């Protein structure tokens, strides 16, 4: 009888272990399916992100092209004006000067239309954000004494710094010794 009880206990234990193993197998299968689903979702998100990145790169290139085209379309009239000026190159020096001045003024209007403005020049305070000091000249200290090359900016973005000489107080020979 004791042996039978022992067998019954073993059978119950074995049955319990079998049920537990089956439950663990079901949980493992569910976890594997969940992992597969998450992996698929991850791969789709990765592909979506890669497609998004490519679209953004293409859009950026397209906008850059549009900007260049806009600038070129705005500048082509200057080329037309230069061609017309060359046709009249035989004219008097004064008429050539007037023509070049008109072309220059038109070019500045185009730059203004593109949002470009000239960096402040002579007599203005030297600003290292917009000016490149290339020398010193007698003049008011800290002020731009002479502009060698104009600078331009578009909003706060610097297109090209102005190359300038900055004023400094004139020193006496005795001060140098």
UniProtKB/Swiss-Prot annotation:
It is found in: Cytoplasm. The keyword Chaperone applies. PROSITE patterns: GRPE (PS01071). Its cofactor is K(+). GO terms for biological process: protein folding. InterPro entries: GrpE, GrpE_coiled_coil, GrpE_head. GO terms for molecular function: adenyl-nucleotide exchange factor activity; protein homodimerization activity; protein-folding chaperone binding; unfolded protein binding. Keywords: Chaperone, Cytoplasm, Stress response. Pfam families: GrpE. GO terms for cellular component: cytoplasm. Required to stimulate the ATPase activity of DnaK. Participates actively in the response to hyperosmotic and heat shock by preventing the aggregation of stress-denatured proteins, in association with DnaK and GrpE. It is the nucleotide exchange factor for DnaK and may function as a thermosensor. Unfolded proteins bind initially to DnaJ; upon interaction with the DnaJ-bound protein, DnaK hydrolyzes its bound ATP, resulting in the formation of a stable complex. GrpE releases ADP from DnaK; ATP binding to DnaK triggers the release of the substrate protein, thus completing the reaction cycle. Belongs to the GrpE family. Homodimer. This is Protein GrpE. It comes from Thermus thermophilus (strain ATCC 27634 / DSM 579 / HB8). The gene is grpE.
């Amino acid at each position: 009888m004791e042996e039978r009880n022992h067998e019954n206990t073993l059978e119950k234990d074995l049955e319990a272990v079998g049920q537990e193993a089956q439950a663990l197998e079901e949980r493992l299968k569910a976890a594997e399916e969940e992992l597969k689903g998450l992996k698929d979702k991850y791969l789709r998100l990765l592909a979506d992100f890669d497609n998004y990145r490519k679209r953004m790169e293409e859009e950026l290139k397209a906008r850059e092209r549009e900007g260049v085209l806009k600038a070129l379309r705005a500048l082509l009239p200057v080329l037309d004006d230069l061609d017309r000026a060359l046709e009249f190159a035989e004219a008097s020096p004064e008429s050539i000067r007037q023509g070049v001045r008109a072309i220059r003024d038109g070019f500045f209007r185009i730059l203004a239309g593109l949002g470009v403005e000239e960096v402040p020049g002579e007599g203005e305070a030297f600003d290292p954000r917009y000016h490149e000091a290339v020398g010193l000249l007698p003049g008011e200290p800290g002020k731009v004494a002479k502009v060698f090359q104009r600078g331009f900016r578009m909003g706060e973005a610097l297109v090209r710094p102005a190359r300038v000489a900055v004023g400094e107080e004139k020193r006496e020979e005795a001060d140098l010794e």
